[in-house]
């Protein structure tokens, strides 16, 4: 009986940890979803090779995962995203998926500032984990990075 109890208890603690470490999205599905992002964003590698042709309203999303928020040189970011980056926000798949769902709400929560705003008004309601996984796949600097610690 003790063995059964111990096994059930161990599983109760293991399942949530396993779910968290394996809850990343599907990069192939995210690449398809990225079509919604192309109106404003492109993905162009450091050598100038175009991975995804897109708009220039938003910053280039190459190597986004693992990068400090609001830090692409020569891009005019909004004040709140720059403040979040200066406060320690480094994009990982989890934070990026949360941001994509509601950028302004994410910044308000992250900065604990009800007046914080994102210049990105688009909200991706479904597939945020997939898009985050796709962006991680075009972020060579993020290899081995699953989830960055939350800044406090």
Across the structure, where does each feature detected by a protein language model lie?
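Positively charged n-region of N-terminal signal peptides that target proteins for export
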Residues: 1-4
